[in-house]
Amino acid sequence: MSVILPEKVLKEVEKVSRSEGTLPEEIINRAVIEFLKLNDPETKAEIHENLSKKYMKDAEEFMKKGDYVQASEKAWGAASQMLKAEAARRGVELRSHSALHRFVITIARERGDEEIRRLWQSAGMLHQNFYENWLPKEMVVENIKDVKDFIKRLKEGR
C-alpha cells in the first residue's frame, strides 16, 4: 500500500521529522494512530517494529548499491525504531536523541547486558555518518552488523 499526500503535507511532515530527528514514516504513522485512536502500547510497538524491519531491509539494499551513507541512516533508523518499540511496550514515548540514549542505559542495566549500550553507540556512529560521510565502507558494514545484533538482543530480552 502507498499513500499519496499533498505537497504541503509532505513538507510539514519533513519539517517535523527534521525537528524531532526522526524519519518521515514515523511522523505519518504517529498521526494515523492518533487520529484513529489506536494509541495502545502494543499497536505502537508493532508500528515501530515494522519500521525497524523496513529500514533494515532498506539498509541492506543501499549496501548492495554501494550507497553507504544511505545504508548508514537506514540502519540507524532500524536501531532507533526497535528501541522505540521496546519503550512503547512500556507506555513510554522516546522523542529525542537524549531520551533514546537514556532508555538504552535503562535497558542495558535491567538486563545486565552492557553490550547493548556499545552496540547502540555503533548505531549512533552510523547516524552521524549520514551527515558527515566520514566512515570507511568497512566500518559501515561492521556497524550494521552491530545494529543487527542490537536488534536481536532487544528482541531476545522480552
Predicted regions and their residues:
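Amphipathic, well-ordered alpha-helical segments in soluble domains
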Residues: 51-55, 81, 150
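Hydrophobic recognition helices of helix-based DNA-binding modules
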Residues: 35, 82-86
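Long, charged low-complexity segments
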Residues: 87-158
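Short, positively charged interaction helices/loops
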Residues: 39-61
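Solenoid-repeat scaffolds in large eukaryotic assemblies
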Residues: 71-72, 78
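Short amphipathic alpha-helical segments
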Residues: 2-5, 13, 20-33
